[in-house]
């Protein structure tokens, strides 16, 4: 049964690295995903790179000093892997998820089978 089940966990937002005026952190771009199951091509981090965590560094976007990460992949690309694994034909991906037309790589590749 382990090869027939995938558990997908996500967060809908990210946080800035630098606290806001009230000592909390502001909403930022991006999110985090975890996928578990027998068909997951696991023990890897997916994406082009892990961003620099330096305030004002090369990966700090927006105003360049708060610690905003720019996402490395779309949630649509992540969902595409799960949809393909569930049996959606590849030629139907952009019909089901029209935003995928904006990306050269349509899926991430974390599912086997």
Residue ranges and their predicted role:
Residues 1-113:
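Feature marks hydrolase-like catalytic cores characterized by long aromatic- and Gly/Pro-rich stretches
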């Amino acid at each position: 049964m382990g090869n027939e089940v995938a558990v997908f966990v996500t967060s809908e937002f990210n946080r800035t690295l630098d606290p806001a005026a009230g000592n909390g952190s502001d909403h930022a771009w991006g999110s985090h995903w975890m996928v578990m199951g027998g068909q997951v091509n696991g023990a890897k981090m997916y994406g082009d790179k892990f961003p620099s965590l330096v305030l004002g560094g090369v990966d700090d976007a927006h105003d360049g000093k708060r610690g905003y990460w720019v996402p490395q992949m779309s949630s649509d690309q992540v969902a595409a892997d799960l949809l393909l694994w569930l049996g959606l034909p590849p030629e139907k991906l952009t019909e089901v998820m029209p935003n995928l037309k904006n990306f050269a790589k349509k899926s991430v590749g974390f599912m086997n089978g």
